[in-house]
Amino acid sequence: MKKNSSHWAEIYQKDIDKKGGNLPYVLNKIIKKKKLINLVRKYSNKNVIECGSGTSVVSIYLAMLGYNVTAIDIEDDVIKLAKSLAKDYYKTIDNPNPQIIFEKKNILDLGYEKDSFDVAFSNGVLEHFSDDEIIQIIKQQLYVAKTVIVGIPTKYFDSSEAKYGNERVLELSYWRYLIKKAGGSIIEEIGMDRESFLKRLFNYKKYFRPKPYHLFVIKNN
């Protein structure tokens, strides 16, 4: 497993502070991850799991919408931070009992029963692992969920955003190869930006450039 979990809570906290605190951070991330959120909603009726959830913003939002959500991460401090974000966000909404479970788990060893979830998803996670680990992770997610959605950076990813230090920016053709090796069949692909439409619209070059992030929707062969 490549990613060094000991600094992730600290990195996330710096991002939260830059955004002005828990609530502004969550609201900002929800806007930026709308394509991912919409894809999860498209393929899930009820039960979803986020693998390598980090601050868990997508999971927090999906639970608010009424989904039964499991968010897993390997680091205790990151889970604690995600719970804090959820608590502050849920104070602002009408849903009195969002169904979200935070669990400490290694995504290389999920341990759930077959088809426990409609969708297993991750975003900005797999690029921190080796080829063999990526294949293992996708295989496990295809076992526990009917549909798997993964978001990864493309070669158009801005290196200044590589704050975590060990991102592997692979060609999309190579990601397709790894997914096939894991026994997956790609049923949909979507490019994704993190910046808002209006912000890109006023930056001509960014608006027309290829997307820096890519989403794969995967099912078993």
Question: Which residues fall in each region the model found?
Answer:
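Hydrophobic adenine-recognition pocket in adenosine-nucleotide-binding enzymes
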Residues: 125
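S-adenosyl-L-methionine-dependent methyltransferase catalytic module, highlighting the catalytic core
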Residues: 121, 129-221
